Amino acid sequence: MLITKISPAVKTEGRYNVFVDGKYSFSLDEVQLAALTIKKGDELDEQQLDQLKSESSFGKNYIRALDLVSRRPRSQREIRDYAFRKQWTKANTDRVIERLLERGYLNDAKFAEIFVRSRANLRNYSTRRMKLELQKKGISSDIIDQVLSESDDFDENVALKNLIAKKQNRYDDEQKLIAYLARQGFNYDSIRMALNQQKSGTIDDE
């Protein structure tokens, strides 16, 4: 088999289409093209062609992963879940994850810090819910515990008081409010204490 043509892709800047025996076979980005040193006129056997096609798939997968992490921080689990849905090969998925880690685009500890900060400021999450949400994202228990213990942004008592102030008018029955707060992951004793402070006018006192 012979590489008969290498030409710039029309729709994707920086990517090149490679033709084998006169037919389109695969595409590579300019970095891959330079690294692999392939050129028009090169002869390929089946194994070499398969390897080049695998590199093509890896390059596309990596660019897609870069696009995902550029939109917002991602955990390793999120990238793996996306790769599974899109049916990437395990080998390519592992390579993509490894390269993202090497280049600092994936960091579960930083992801957890940003997640905690955003939920603390906007969502009034309980510690329990914060942990559950981070676990769903694939963050290890050690990282979760460390981030929560070191965070200056997260205070469960403040989150609980804020949520009471926000939701109290919606629940004219205190027991329903307590049940709602419990479903959000706050424990009964903390809920009772916060409600008693609110009734006595000390909800903002520390």
Regions found by a protein language model. Name each.
Residues 1-206:
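An alpha-helical, amphipathic repeat domain used for nucleic-acid recognition
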